[in-house]
From Swiss-Prot:
Lineage: Bacteria, Bacillati, Bacillota, Bacilli, Bacillales
Pfam families: ACPS
E.C. no: 2.7.8.7
Similarity annotation: Belongs to the P-Pant transferase superfamily. AcpS family.
Protein known as: Holo-[acyl-carrier-protein] synthase
Gene symbol of the encoding locus: acpS
Origin species: Listeria monocytogenes serovar 1/2a (strain ATCC BAA-679 / EGD-e)
InterPro entries (alphabetical): 4-PPantetheinyl_Trfase_dom, 4-PPantetheinyl_Trfase_dom_sf, ACPS, Ppantetheine-prot_Trfase_dom
EC category: transferase
GO CC aspect terms: cytoplasm
Cofactor: Mg(2+)
GO molecular function, one term: magnesium ion binding
Family matches, as NCBIfam families: acpS, pantethn_trn
């Protein structure tokens, strides 16, 4: 049974401007393990990665029905790339839940969809 579906989209230029103004934004959005993956990329690919993770985390919060705030923060949600290249939500998956995530990019935006199944 589906618990929730979340979808989010973000402009890459907006993310780039935020990072240029406040580089700590990266640490507010990404976990330590995600930062290690982020650091492997160069140039615009870094912005795509960050924007994709931001959108995926927003989509997760929407699918979970909580949004971000008191009960959930960006670094509570971890999305790592598995060996075959797919993004995989590793935190905070609850027992009995399956979480499916898809992240996509264009030249101007990143979008993500999350489905939580129980």
């Amino acid at each position: 049974m589906i618990k929730g579906i979340g979808l989010d989209m973000i402009d890459l230029e907006r993310v780039k401007q935020v990072v240029e103004k406040n580089p700590r934004f990266i640490e507010r959005v990404l976990t330590e393990k995600e930062i290690k993956q982020f650091e492997k990329y160069e140039g615009n690919r870094k912005i795509e990665f960050l924007a994709g993770r931001f959108a995926a985390k927003e989509a997760y919060a929407k699918a979970n029905g909580t949004g971000f705030g008191k009960h959930l923060s960006f670094t509570d949600v971890e999305i790592l790339q598995v060996e075959d290249g797919r993004p995989h939500v590793t935190l905070p998956v609850k027992s009995g839940e399956n979480v499916f995530v898809s992240i996509t990019h264009t030249a101007r935006s990143a979008a993500a969809q999350v489905i939580i199944e129980i």
